[in-house]
Amino acid sequence: MYSSRAAGGVLALLTGAALLAGTTPASAVAADFPAGDEGYHTYAEVTTELQKAAANHPDIAVLSSVGKSFEGRELNLVKISDNAAADEGEPEVLFTCNQHAREHLTTEMCLHIVQRFTDGYASDPNIRSLVDDHVIWVIPNVNPDGAEYDISGADYKYWRKNRRPVDGDKIGTDLNRNWGYKWGCCDGSSTRPASETYRGPSAFSEPETQAVSRFVDSRAAGGQQRIKTHIDFHTYSELVLWPFGHTEDDTGEGMTAEENARFRDVGQRMAATNGYKAQQSSDLYVTDGDVNDWMWGTHKILSFTFEMYPTGPFPGFYPPDEDIARETTRNDAAVDILIREAR
C-alpha cells in the first residue's frame, strides 16, 4: 500500500528507475527470485502449491479462478470449507494479496493461509472449527503480471502497478486506487500515468480489479452479501488499517459511530496479537479508490488492510526469505479473529 508520498526519500530515489524500466511493455516470466531469495514463490510456483493443496485435500479445498490478468494469467482463487464442493450458505471470509507487485511477502501470507487451513484441518481442533463453520476464500496474486515483472532478471525493479499500457508509452495502474467507491474523489490518487498512485482512466478500468470485484459482487444473494470480513495484505509498516481512506472523518456518510467502533475494536484486537499498530487508513494518508473503502462502502464487508513487516525501508519491500515463516505465522491469531468475526 505504501505510496511514494508516504515512503519519503528512499522511494523517491527508486521511482525514477522503476518508471524508466516500465516504459517498454513486455510480458515477463520469472524463472526465480533474485539470488538469495529463492525461498519466495514465483507465480508458477504458487500455482503449483495451490494445485497440490486442492489435490491433497479435495473435500475441503477447491482451486478455481476469478478471471485473468492483462497478460492472461489466471487470478487463482482457493475455496476452503468443510464441504467445499457445495454452497452451504455459511458466512464467508476473503483474503487478498499482492495488489502491489513488489509486495511479495503478501503472496507468501496468502499461501500460508491456504496451507495452514488445509494441512492443519485433520489435526488442529481450532482450524477444524473455523473451516467447518465458514467459507474461506483466498486470492494470493491479484497482480501477477506486475509481480513477475518485478522479479524478472537478476535484480528487483521496485515495481508497484499492473502492466497494462496507458497513455501511449507509460505502463501500469495502481490497482489499489482503481476501485469504484469514491474513485478519484479526494486527492488520494493521481491522474498522471507516470505516477505510482495513478488511478487509471476510470474506476475498474483494469482487468484485475474488474475480476475480483465481480467475484465479490457474485457472493451477494437475496440482498445479503455472504462475504462478511476481508483482509488485503500489503507491505510494509506493521499496521492494521480500516476504512475510510478517502476521508479523515471517523464517521459520516457510510459509517456510523457504532460501525466505526466495531472496526476499531476488531482492528485493535488483531493488532494485539501481532504487535502491529491499529488505526484508520486515512490517519496514515488519504487514499481514494482503495479496496477497503469499496468493500465496506459497497458491500458492508468488514475490510482491513494489513501492512506487514518490516516497519521501515530497510529491508522495506524485500525482506530476506528467511523471514517468511516468522512473519506469516505472526498473523495466525489475527487471521483467526477475522474469521470468527464473519457471522
What annotation goes with each model-predicted range?
Residues 8, 28-74:
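Short glycine- and acidic-rich boundary segments immediately preceding or forming the N-terminal edge
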Residues 58-62, 73-75, 89-93, 132-137, ...:
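Loop/turn elements at helix/coil->beta-strand transitions in domains of secreted/extracellular proteins
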Residues 1-30:
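Secretory targeting and sorting signals
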Residues 29-33, 47, 51-55, 79, ...:
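Soluble secreted/lumenal catalytic domains
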Residues 3-8, 32-36, 189-343:
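C-terminal accessory segments enriched in acidic
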Residues 77-87, 98:
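Short beta-strand-to-loop junctions in surface cap/lid or active-site-entrance loops
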Residues 90, 104-108, 112-251, 312:
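Active-site/substrate-binding loop(s) of hydrolase catalytic cores
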